[in-house]
């Protein structure tokens, strides 16, 4: 695996995904994130472990297709993006919703 600077690792993870499917996966200790399209599975694993101080057991990724958007009579496309489903060790947990 290539060495990546810690700041570059933080830039790989764009945002957590909170959808119905993602909340069902939370029960299995799996978290879903939007990631940079060029990020590899080892880089995503290193970034999650560095940012959240957890132990990652598996990383699954998939590409979502571009979405068409219409502005008046012009049709454009939103860019493609990549999602990662990260499985954590049973004793690890990421707090997405801090207690108030």
Swiss-Prot record:
Domain of life (superkingdom): Bacteria
GO terms classed as biological process: translation
GO cellular component, one term: ribonucleoprotein complex
MF terms in GO: rRNA binding; structural constituent of ribosome
Keywords linked to the UniProt accession: Ribonucleoprotein, Ribosomal protein, RNA-binding, rRNA-binding
Functional summary from the UniProt entry: One of the early assembly proteins it binds 23S rRNA. One of the proteins that surrounds the polypeptide exit tunnel on the outside of the ribosome. Forms the main docking site for trigger factor binding to the ribosome.
Description of how the protein assembles with itself and partners: Part of the 50S ribosomal subunit. Contacts protein L29, and trigger factor when it is bound to the ribosome.
NCBIfam families named among the record's database cross-references: PRK05738.2-4, PRK05738.3-4
Family designation: Belongs to the universal ribosomal protein uL23 family.
Protein name per UniProt: Large ribosomal subunit protein uL23
Organism from which the protein derives: Thermosynechococcus vestitus (strain NIES-2133 / IAM M-273 / BP-1)
């Amino acid at each position: 695996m290539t060495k990546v600077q810690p700041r570059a690792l933080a830039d790989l993870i764009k945002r957590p995904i909170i959808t119905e499917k993602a909340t069902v996966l939370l029960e299995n200790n799996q978290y879903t994130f939007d990631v940079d399209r060029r990020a590899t599975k080892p880089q995503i694993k290193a970034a999650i472990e560095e940012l959240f101080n957890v132990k990652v057991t598996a990383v699954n990724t998939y590409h979502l297709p571009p979405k068409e958007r219409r502005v008046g009579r012009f049709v454009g496309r939103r860019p493609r993006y990549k999602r990662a489903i990260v499985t954590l060790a049973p004793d690890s947990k990421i707090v997405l919703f801090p207690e108030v």
